[in-house]
Amino acid sequence: MLFVELVVQGLVYGCMYAMMAVGLTLVYGLLRILHIAHAGVFALGAYMTVTVANATGSLALGFLVATVVSAIAGIAIYRLAYQPILHHAAFVPMVVSIGLFIVMQEAFRLIFGAYGIAFDKNPWYVAHVNLVGINLTYVEIAMVIMSVVLLVGFGLFAGLTRAGIGWRATVTDPHMATSFGVDPVRVRYVNFLFGSALAGIAGGLVGLLNNYVEPTMGGAVSYKALAIVVLGGLGSVRGTLIASLVLGVVEAFGAIYLANIFDRDAIGFLFLIVVLMVRPQGLLGRG
């Protein structure tokens, strides 16, 4: 039973990692930019969720506002920070992204305080259900359901709709896609809108899971998301999804059997190092 419980716990965290890391993969696949500021959007979504939920008593409204604000923030980051420097050397957008993330962290500290905000009412934090002997909180169940629905929805969008096929074509060969009438600028906006909305929702869910939100909460998650993107193969959405779930399960087992040696985050990065020693291109990256 412990084995099954650890697998389930790992998959739950893997779903959360996937919601965060997919946005990074989408941006890298399209623009070849390591979008570090994505972690700031994650924290922004968490703050919007807790602020609106505490003010109105409605978690649903909190998530709705977080999704919209995060999506708008993502589009603004692309339009104001990335679009003017797309033709610069590759390190320039990365430096800008890191600087923007630091600015966002400090802004959260100034606006919301340095010690974080707790949810006034969070019944999901303690309420749980028992599934075949495994206790799961409502937050964990919601995390799995929302991540599956959103990621499957994105897969259907990318595979079945004209806009989704245009997005895939732009990622594969932007010049060829443009010659067939695909607007690359519109594709980039959709890319940032969807990826940022996912990050905002993930931030709200992690805030619920921890029952509080703090200015630096995006830091550790951003490092983990970057590790997942590399582990899955840079630019591979499918690789990112698989790497997220695998890393979640590895961390769950490591937190039990290696707790006296490594903490949970260290286990994840150790696993990344081992995999990259064997497959430098990542799980599904091209050699």
Residue ranges with predicted function:
Residues 132-213, 237-242:
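Helix-loop-helix "hairpin" substructures at the membrane interface of multi-pass membrane proteins
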Residues 57-101, 107, 242-247, 251, ...:
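Alpha-helical transmembrane segments within multi-pass membrane transporters and channels
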Residues 1-20, 48, 59-62, 88-94, ...:
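Membrane-interfacial amphipathic/re-entrant helices at transmembrane-helix boundaries
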Residues 1-16, 157-162, 191-229, 252-265:
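Inter-helical junctions in multi-pass inner-membrane proteins, predominant
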Residues 70, 224-247, 251, 270-278:
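Hydrophobic alpha-helical transmembrane segments of polytopic membrane proteins
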Residues 15, 24-46, 87-92, 163-166, ...:
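Short, non-helical or kinked segments that cap or interrupt transmembrane helices
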Residues 8, 30-76, 80:
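Membrane-embedded helix boundary and interhelical linker motif in transport proteins
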